[in-house]
Amino acid sequence: MAGEPDDVDTMVEPVVPSRHRWLAGLLGAGPGDRVADLGCGTGGTLAQAAPAVPGGLVAGLDLSAGALARTAEAVAGAVAGQDRPPGALLVQADLKDPLSLATAGFDRVLCHNVLEVLPDHDALVAEAVRVLRPDGRLVLAHSDFDTLIFASEDLELTRRLVRAYCDTQQPWMDAVDGTIGRRLAEIAGRAGLQVTDVQAQVVLGRRYLPGEIGWGYARNLADTLLGAGRADEAELDRWMAGLQRLHDRGAFLFSVNDSAVICGRMPR
């Protein structure tokens, strides 16, 4: 990928434990399983999955060295004191390139919030299929950024900002496809996979405070659109001040839809 945010603390993923519990549940890994997370970020999902795979392996690939360091800490903390903790393999990798993982080496493979930023979605999915064991499970999951909801004092401005954000390529992205979450089954089908289930969840935030998901997305939206010249500073300041007032009244609300397809190889 073109790059990653310099400061992994600005990422919104780690502050949504419910999302990572959901993803780990979809993987359904068990003792001895080998689990790979392609684009693991700071390790939220691997930390949820690791305790379920004693004697197995959790592998995380990400472009950001800082995120991988956080993943190592998260996984170690999650399995501390376990009799047979899984091994951990963390690899700094650009997911545009072929994966440095063994063919048919993993029982469970996850790709979450990665496909949008790659120019060739199908290439990464093909690599995910390659490293999946014949009876393994692949989970493709993605937020649909066109479903971002902010309670707002200016509905039309919010709609315009969200649409622009959904369609704007950030500097660290090689591509942008903000509605990809609704097309995961199509992508899986092109790879010759059998979709066994489709799931969705709503990620919800009720507070507009640093470290909360609604705050994180609002700030990233503002920085992205200002940097791309798609919104001016005055209207963004006005919009965020309105979000703060809603929070102060107990009326702030944020949500985004996450979709996932659970896949396996077609039976022969």
Task: Specify the residue positions occupied by each region the protein language model found.
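A short acidic, Gly/Pro-enriched loop at the edge of an enzyme's catalytic core
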Residues: 99-109
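Class I SAM-dependent methyltransferase SAM/SAH-binding core
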Residues: 36, 42-98
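Class I SAM-dependent methyltransferase Rossmann-like catalytic core
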Residues: 1-17
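C-terminal helical/coil "lid" or tail adjacent to the Rossmann-like core of SAM-dependent
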Residues: 2-7, 196-254
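A short SAM/SAH-binding and catalytic strip from SAM-dependent methyltransferases
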Residues: 107-121
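Conserved alpha-helix/loop element of class I SAM-dependent methyltransferases that forms part
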Residues: 14-31, 48
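A short glycine-rich, Lys/Arg-flanked "PGG" loop and its adjoining helix->strand segment in the class I
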Residues: 122-134
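Conserved catalytic/acceptor-binding region of the Class I
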Residues: 139-208
